[in-house]
Design a protein with these regions (language model features):
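Generic recognition of long tandem-repeat/solenoid scaffolds
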Residues: 78-84, 109-112, 190, 195-201
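N-terminal low-complexity, intrinsically disordered segments
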Residues: 17, 22-90
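Short helix-loop boundary/capping segments
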Residues: 107-161
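Short, solvent-exposed coil/turn segments at beta-strand boundaries
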Residues: 102-104, 137, 192-195
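C-terminal interaction module
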Residues: 1-44, 145-213
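Generic detector of solvent-exposed, compositionally biased contiguous segments
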Residues: 72-92, 166-185
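Short amphipathic beta-strand and strand-loop transition segments with alternating hydrophobic
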Residues: 93-99, 186-189
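Glycine-rich, often proline-containing surface loops adjacent to acidic residues and nearby aromatics
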Residues: 1-6, 95-116
Length: 213
């Protein structure tokens, strides 16, 4: 099954300096699963991906700098790299000044191998969430979501009050207005960084629990 990891935080510096934290995160998650070990530049073809050398910190920082320079607006996003098997790997997404000035975001769309590992191991899910929350403090909100759950129909149903993708595991900052309600609904709470990681039931039941919000 495919999973999506995403975190939104308050940036501590400019996008390039935030890139150094992204590089630290890459180094920290590499040992967690074989598909996270080798990171390559995003490519337009399979052949190009196969021929590309692994990314370096300098490559990542230059990629962010170039994206910022060529963007017409202060807010911009980019997909600089992927890890794992070509065509079935894990895609890295970054955003800056979105949705608000000073915000920064990181996302990881898992491939088949890492997705299957997350299906089988809650410990891996917890470690991935904890590592991400620790590196990107101060965080605002984050989550780990399974992609097969239906998307909420916002024309029919109200959006979640926290205005974020609902997740099996979610991070809320301790000063978040949603922290208390998360505490009431969670089946497990693990303090970390400037808040806590909340687990809502199981990968199958978390949408039902969060719909009580």
């Amino acid at each position: 099954m495919r999973w999506d990891l995403s975190f939104k935080r308050q940036a501590l510096g400019d996008p390039v300096s935030e890139g150094r934290r992204v590089w630290e995160w890459i180094q920290r998650v590499r040992p967690l699963h074989p598909s996270l070990d080798l990171w390559r530049p995003t490519a337009e073809s399979r052949e190009e991906a196969e021929q590309s050398p692994p990314i370096t910190q300098d490559y990542l920082l230059q990629y962010i700098h170039d994206a910022q320079t060529t963007s017409r607006y202060p807010d911009f996003s980019l997909a600089p790299a992927f890890s794992g098997q070509i065509g079935q790997g894990n895609k890295l997404d970054l955003s800056f000044n979105m949705p608000n000035p000073g915000n920064a975001g990181i996302g990881l769309m898992t491939g088949e191998a890492l997705g299957s590992a997350l299906d089988a191991s809650e410990e891996l899910a917890d470690t991935l969430m904890h590592t991400t929350a620790s590196i990107f403090s101060p965080n605002i909100i984050g989550g780990l979501s399974r992609s097969d759950h239906p998307i909420k129909n916002l024309n029919r149903d109200k959006p979640y009050p926290f205005f974020y993708v609902p997740g099996w595991k979610m991070f809320f900052a301790s000063d978040s207005p949603h922290y208390q309600r998360a505490t009431q609904l969670a089946t497990n709470i693990a303090p970390v960084s400037n808040g806590a990681i909340f687990t809502f039931g199981t990968p199958d039941t978390y949408p039902t629990i969060l719909n009580q919000w």
